Amino acid sequence: RVCYAIPLPICY
């Protein structure tokens, strides 16, 4: 599981 917060918070 990978989560990013740029530009919006999204988790794959």
Curated annotation (Swiss-Prot):
Keyword tags: Amidation, Amphibian defense peptide, Antibiotic, Antimicrobial, Disulfide bond, Fungicide, Secreted
Residues bearing the modification Tyrosine amide: 12
Main location: secreted
Superkingdom, taxonomy of origin: Eukaryota
GO CC annotation: extracellular region
GO biological process, one term: killing of cells of another organism
Tissue specificity as recorded in UniProt: Expressed by the skin glands.
Disulphide bond pairs: 3-11
Subcellular location: Secreted
Function: Antibacterial activity against B.subtilis, E.coli, S.aureus, M.luteus and P.putida. Antifungal activity against S.cerevisiae.
Name of the protein this chain belongs to: Tigerinin-3
Organism: Hoplobatrachus tigerinus (Indian bull frog)
